């Protein structure tokens, strides 16, 4: 179910825009639908037909998603979320009141270093199911930032994701720059985002400056050369007034050489953006491994000292074997599941 469908149902119960907005706000804050205002109880505010429908509506909303299991970790608690049809997605409670949500069950891009991509795309996550992940998190703690970096490629579920972003940036009371749309790069994204009422921050999965290598690592991503992707990102960054996050998963011996670093400096120097280097969350038996800690430090120092802002981001859930897609793979017993190895707890990396 999409939120637009739910909104029409509220209208059918006699709810005016002010009533529908109130219902959306209290739900997105994790509160009961009959929560009143400071001055009035809901029985003096909501239409009678809507009040009588609230128990059934509450049951329906609660049935959208539930926490199947919670896995606490030093870098954030990962929630395995069961949807109404039994499919599962993952959400991560991040430090500083952040939340990472999933936008698809599985993913069609098939990134070679991502567990989610191994299962392929199973189905889209609706806007209501995306919002339900936020509701579940807010019933546990405050959520002031939502990043669309969980399972799935948001660009492949654009209507549902944009609808969720619009609700979170209005009725959900989250600042627009604290809503982060993450994508491998799709021209539809650069066409759609500038036209939205709520214009989110943008994270672009760059990973390499070499077009051929990027095509191998992200086999079903749109064919956009890295330099063109950066130019598209720069145009959007200048339009909205906050920087692009360029994502770079560090793979030992693949994209961590000085030739790559020099090339990324040429691409990003002077651009309104930040390079997020993400040491790979190692999987036993996988083709890829993360660079050692000293090499990661060298990379950060090298890039930072030459004028490009760089930050180290570690994939949340490493100490609970919970990198993106891993909990779902274990829970569903997917054929593609490999034996997981806990990566060493990341140490602080000094620039």
Curated annotation (Swiss-Prot):
Positions annotated as active site in the UniProt record: 90 (proton acceptor), 324 (s-methylcysteine intermediate)
Keywords for this protein: 4Fe-4S, Cytoplasm, Disulfide bond, Iron, Iron-sulfur, Metal-binding, Methyltransferase, S-adenosyl-L-methionine, Transferase
Cofactor: [4Fe-4S] cluster
Residues that, per the record, bind S-adenosyl-L-methionine: 152-153, 182, 205-207, 281
SS bond partners: 100-324
Principal location: cytoplasm
Protein name per its UniProtKB record: Probable RNA methyltransferase BAV1540
Source species of the chain: Bordetella avium (strain 197N)
């Amino acid at each position: 179910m999409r939120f637009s469908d739910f909104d029409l149902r509220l209208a059918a119960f006699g709810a005016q825009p002010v009533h529908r907005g109130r219902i959306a706000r209290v739900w997105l804050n994790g509160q009961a639908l009959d929560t009143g205002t400071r001055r009035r109880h809901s029985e003096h505010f909501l239409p009678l037909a809507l009040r009588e429908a609230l128990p059934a509506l509450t049951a329906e909303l609660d049935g959208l998603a539930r926490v199947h299991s919670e896995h606490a970790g030093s870098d954030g608690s990962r929630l395995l979320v069961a949807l109404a049809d039994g499919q599962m997605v993952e959400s991560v409670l991040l430090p500083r009141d952040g939340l990472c949500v999933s936008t698809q069950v599985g993913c069609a891009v098939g990134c070679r270093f991502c567990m989610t991509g191994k299962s392929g795309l199973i189905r889209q996550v609706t806007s209501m199911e995306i919002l339900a992940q936020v509701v579940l998190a807010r019933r546990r703690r405050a959520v002031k930032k939502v990043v669309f970096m969980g399972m799935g490629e948001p660009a492949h579920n654009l209507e549902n994701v944009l609808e969720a972003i619009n609700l979170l940036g209005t009725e959900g009371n989250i600042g627009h720059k604290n809503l982060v749309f993450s994508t491998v790069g799709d021209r539809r994204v650069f066409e759609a985002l500038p036209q939205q009422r709520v214009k989110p921050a943008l994270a672009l999965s760059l990973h390499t400056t070499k077009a051929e290598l990027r095509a191998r690592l992200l086999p079903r991503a749109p064919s956009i050369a890295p330099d063109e992707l950066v130019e598209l990102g720069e145009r959007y960054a200048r339009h909205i007034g906050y920087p692009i996050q360029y994502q770079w998963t560090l793979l030992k011996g693949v994209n961590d050489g000085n030739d790559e670093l020099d090339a990324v400096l040429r691409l990003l120097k002077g651009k309104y953006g930040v390079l997020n280097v993400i040491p790979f969350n190692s999987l036993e038996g996988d083709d890829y491994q993360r660079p050692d800690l000293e090499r990661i430090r060298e990379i950060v120092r090298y890039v930072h000292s030459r004028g490009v802002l760089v930050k180290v981001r570690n994939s949340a859930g490493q100490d609970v074997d919970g990198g993106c897609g891993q909990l779902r793979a274990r829970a569903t017993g997917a054929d593609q599941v490999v034996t997981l190895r806990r990566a060493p707890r990341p140490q602080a990396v000094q620039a």
